[in-house]
Amino acid sequence: QYTQFTTQITINICMIDTQGKLLIAPPNMPDPRFRKTVVYIWRHDVSGAAGVMVNKKCQQPDFKHICNEGLVHRLPKVNHPVYYGGPILTNVVGVLHSTDFILTSTNTLTEDKVGFTLDRKMLEVIAKGQGPKNMLITLGMASWNSSQLEEEIEHPHTPAMSWLMLDYDEKLVFGQLADSKPDDIWEECVSRAIRSKTAEITSKLFRD
């Protein structure tokens, strides 16, 4: 049965602060679970990091099935897509959403522009056709132990295997077309991240 739970975030200083940012799997990602994925990091502190994939739609279960399993009353017209959030806690339903609607349990991030909620109440509101304007319903999540994500970014097996990073972009995350291919957003993110990294290196060369 699908479950929802609440959580509190303790923000601490990390070597690399990825909280509220997008992690993009490199083209040579060695872990098949993360190939061609874009991950929104909703927590990053000294205990580790957690995020949800935002570009992999689930064929099953759909929103109707999740509501039925959780005994959540759903209006027939409400049937949002469900996204595969990651390879752990695959029975946990989360909602990544705009902050025009939040609960006391919502984790607000990115200058309060986006929230991530692990709370049954959010699912109940959405099932009534209410709630935030923009949302991604996720099933499962990605998780890293303390310092693990920093190590994967700073000291990968080869430079080509390092995660790419982008600032959060509402249009990228919530602007995905309903009929777009799952890889479309990943390809756009890789392109943007490479351009950003190239500009950063070029700027550093001129400064030095």
Question: What label would you give each PLM region?
Answer:
Residues 1-14:
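Short, Lys/Arg-enriched N-terminal segments with co-localized hydrophobic residues
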Residues 15-208:
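A short aromatic-anchored loop/beta-hairpin motif
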